[in-house]
Amino acid sequence: MTEMNSTADLAPHAVTPLAAIRDRIARAAAIAGRKPAEVTLIAVSKTHPVEAIEPLLEQGQRVFGENRVQEAAEKWPALRERYPDVALHLIGQLQSNKAADAVALFDSIHAVDRPSLVKALGKAMDESGRRPDCFLQVNIGDEPQKGGCAIAELPALLEAARTAGLPVAGLMCLPPADVEPAPYFALLGKLARDHGLTGLSMGMSDDFETAVTIGATHVRIGSALFGARGTRA
């Protein structure tokens, strides 16, 4: 055995960011008496190139999130030929005129927040026969600069979505920045229970452990997996 081989054999295996995040999810779930399998890790690959995504695919990650339909359409068809079991989630705001493209490409749509989008998605689903799961986005902090329906508008939006045939999996939120997120996550959980929904898309790189302890079923992790976000022209 050469000295080089001996040194390599003795070197400890580095813990990847993906493994570290999965471990943190498992620990947070245990605190709440939950199973790690109850939490879906969405690796948010928006603005990151294929070269940054492939290592996670090789490590077994199969659920990814994108913000924009066009960007996802540029990256994912070729990757899906090699990894056909990938589930792709749209987590950004969606224009109604992109509804058909989103339905064709994504397996889940997280930011359904207005009646016009519900109508467009319902039409696209009827025409294509594809019915991605949908999460209704709630503006949980009543912030005018953010998307999401007002809490008071949620019952009507949910009724419209169900009438249009959207498979409503649950609710999604982005809590206000620089404040304790737990009360907002708890409020989203209460709203979901009140409306007979079980899915909770909440929690990002800075607060996903809190979200998991409060009941998140989907956490959206970007920078903790990929590092600083890239930019697009």
PLM feature spans:
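Conserved alpha/beta-domain cores
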Residues: 2-198, 204-206, 212-214, 226-228
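Active-site loop ensemble at the mouth of alpha/beta enzyme cores that anchors a bound cofactor
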Residues: 232-233
